[in-house]
Amino acid sequence: MRFSPLYSGSSGNCSIVTIGKTNILVDAGMTGKAILSALETVGVDPCKLNAIVVTHEHSDHIKGVGVFSRKYDIPVYANERTWKAMSPLIGDVSMHNIRTFVNGQNFYIGDADITPFNISHDAADPVGYSFCGGGARIVYMTDTGCVNETLRTIASGADLLFLEANHDVDMLKRGPYPYPLKKRILSEKGHLSNVAAGEFLKKLFPTGVRRVILAHLSRENNTEQIAYSTVRQALVDDGIPEKEFFLTVAHRERVTGIFDL
């Protein structure tokens, strides 16, 4: 299994999961040109993409979905409510490429066993994903205003966790956003803070989670260094030695790297 965050942040999101010969884009929230450039960087031919799986209908996750599906004849997977919400936003998609799933029920795309799960965000029916194959498991969990025991159970034991660390609460409160937007971000239907991500990871460490990529950082209310330092310190303060975990931050405007599992 291989995972590459191509772009991650409040301005656009797209990652690729490769299991065996199966290549799956998770969201396509950048322009087609930008996604093509990133795929070239990680050595994936867009003609060999097997699917796009969509987390929710916000523009920073679907901007390139329609373009890519039409140009490369790629199936697009989303639940019914997300399809209904995003259809007017992405243009026509061929009927044979419209695929739906039910949250909580696994499905297969080639070599990948995928389970979509509910998250808490102000979208029609947002999901995260668990990808299994090749003896490994990746959990993709962004755009969630809170984490609960159900999400902890889903993430437990993951070989790699792609986890939102959207904002520093103090930066957000002091920043230029209007109050209603600040309130939305801080709500249970908003985004996960650095501190909340750290607290969540402390509970996951005993389950075997050791590799974590922090994701979906806000441009205005966070920095890579602040997110990394806050989460790292939470783990260290909990008595977890640094040598026992791998922690990094997904980049906003360039490929973060290639992670083999």
Where are these regions (language model features)?
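Cap/insert and terminal regions of metallo-dependent hydrolase folds
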Residues: 149-248
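Metal-dependent catalytic neighborhoods of phosphoester/phosphodiester hydrolases
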Residues: 63-72, 87-89, 222-229
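Structured catalytic core of nucleotide-sugar glycosyltransferases
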Residues: 4-14, 55-65, 87, 116
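Active-site neighborhood of phospho(di)ester-bond hydrolases with catalytic His/Asp-centered motifs
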Residues: 26-29, 50-57, 77-80, 139-142, ...
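Active-site environment of divalent metal-dependent phosphoester hydrolases
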Residues: 59-62, 84-85, 124, 147-149, ...
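Active-site metal-binding motif and surrounding structural segment of the metallo-beta-lactamase
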Residues: 33-78
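Conserved beta-strand hairpin/beta-sheet module of binuclear metal-dependent hydrolase folds
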Residues: 1-42, 127-143, 160
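Metallo-beta-lactamase
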Residues: 80-128, 132-135
